[in-house]
């Protein structure tokens, strides 16, 4: 198994510069694009500034909760390598993947072990799976 690391919720240029210039940066750096309930949500104006920072050896990830066409169009020219999608059906994910030519991280919300098996629905559309707890903005744990 190949393990990858991701830091998510980056919203400050100073912190992002530190991360990308670290001797051992994470493979993925996530930016919460369209979920204002999260205290780590990044306003689009700040996001544009963050995207000016060279990612070097990391991949930039747009974290999106059931994104609408407006937000997808607004970020399409930004240098994201992956879109991490929450609360999307496989058909919507496939459509986003084809239209925007991005790799996809499908986030599967886990309440219990049955939810883990949901990954099977996304086999055709997903490049990476991320299993996350319910309550995105609350950083809740799960068994």
Question: Which residues make up each language-model segment?
Answer:
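Conserved N-terminal beta1-alpha1 strand-loop-helix module at the mouth
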Residues: 1-142
